[in-house]
Amino acid sequence: MDFESSSAGPSTSYAEEPCTLSMLPQVSAVLSETSITESNVSCQLHPSRSAALNDNVRTLIYNRTDPHIQLDMRAFYNCMEYEEALQPNYHYFTGVQENITPFHREQAIDWIYDVAKEENCDGDVFLLAVSLIDRFMSVQNILKHDIQMIAGVALFIASKLKAPHPMTASKIAYYSDNSCPIDMILQWELLIVTTLQWETESPTAFSFFDFLASRIPQIHNMRGDFQTVVQKCQKMHKLATLFPSMQCAIGLYYVSNLPTQNKELAVKIKDLLANMFQLEVNLLDSYIPMVQRCMSTTPIYTSEDAEKTEPTPSAPASTQEPEAFQELKELKEEPLPTPPPEEPAFQKLVLLEPIPLSEQTPSTPLNDSGFSSDVSSPASSEKKRRRSTDWFEEDSTPPKIFKTL
């Protein structure tokens, strides 16, 4: 096989010439570490090339367009089908979680975002970590002090799957100021992957970005802005729990309509989104305010006790009775005329004594808390109040991206 013309092996422009025994006197001045053991000769690469291979600044390599994969609609449809099976539950804050709120989630997302940025991780690593966090919290109730551990372990797992240089457990412990011990990180890693049934690899917004960029090459120039927008949107759980294809469409639609972008290119991208995802692109306008909110420097959820606001105290009962009750009371106090006694036609037999009014069953049924059904119990009122707080977003089903076969 000719490796010089194939991408499967190294070419002569990057490989050193083979060292032989006859060349040792000439290369002894260049190579400082050369050992001869019988017929084996170990040579050291040139320092400049060795430094380029071991450079930790660039820890990612963008993939080139493969027309057999990224231009094939079957691969695109497979990603869309796969994302439906691994979508997180948007309502897990009210249906599963009892101790954490979107405020705690936003803090954890901000932390792993800073860690991924410090480690020069690809944007795909961070998106996969957020997906693992939301999927795990969709099925498992956790405590408040475990959210940082779960976020760090999710980034640890995602770096193993996506990063060329995976992060180690010691780095996660270091960035957490040793609040996440190494042994606990490994235990939580096993718990998360078993809870998710080892389905840790899921499509992200970048998976669909590559499909779109392969059809319009100018989209590659938007990768930096697209990565920033999609990563910032992960702070809001309503956007983060959308389908990755929907996140890609929202992010690319937002970036293409920035004032610095070409208007003709924005029209092409709009048509491409409509053709690829089979959706009305105008529906994406409803998500633009949420994206702008995520892009701002202010936190989305400003207080961790936003959902724990004290109930509004009711006004004290007035000691003065209403006029209607006073009139009714005056009517009751007036003596009523006594009718003349009548002879009973027959003697009434009293079989059962009437039940006292105080012991009768109330007209309204009682609930399990002992309160009347028209008055909520403290637990139920707390639950209703939590569902109507400021941090809970309006429940609206996002437009579904549907496929055409």
Swiss-Prot record:
CC per GO annotation: cyclin D1-CDK4 complex; cyclin-dependent protein kinase holoenzyme complex; cytoplasm; microtubule organizing center; nucleus
Superkingdom to which the source organism belongs: Eukaryota
Pfam families for this protein: Cyclin_N
Keyword Cell division: yes
A GO molecular-function descriptor: cyclin-dependent protein serine/threonine kinase regulator activity
Region spans: Disordered: 301-405
Keywords recorded for this protein, A-Z: Cell cycle, Cell division, Cyclin, Differentiation, Gonadal differentiation
Keyword ATP-binding: no
Disruption phenotype: Arrested cell division in the G1 phase during larval development. RNAi-mediated knockdown results in an arrest at L2 stage which is associated with uncoordinated movements, a slightly shorter and stouter body morphology, growth arrest and premature death. In addition, during larval development, cell division is impaired in P blast cells and mesoblast M cells due to an arrest prior to S phase. Lack of cell division in somatic gonad precursors Z1 and Z4 which is associated with a failure to maintain germline proliferation resulting in an abnormal gonad development.
Coiled-coil blocks: none
SMART domains xrefs: CYCLIN (SM00385)
One of the GO BP terms on file: regulation of cell cycle G1/S phase transition
Domain Cyclin N-terminal: 76-200
Chain intervals with Polar residues compositional bias: 311-321, 358-380
Biased composition (Basic and acidic residues): 326-335
Function: In association with cdk-4, regulates the progression through the G1 phase of the cell cycle during postembryonic development. Regulates proliferation of the coelomocyte lineage and intestinal cells during late embryogenesis. In complex with cdk-4, involved in sex determination during gonadogenesis by regulating the asymmetric division of the somatic gonadal precursor cell (SGP).
The family this protein is said to belong to: Belongs to the cyclin family. Cyclin D subfamily.
Subunit-level organization: Interacts with cdk-4; the interaction is likely involved in regulating cdk-4 activity.
Name used for this protein in its record: G1/S-specific cyclin-D
Organism expressing this protein natively: Caenorhabditis elegans
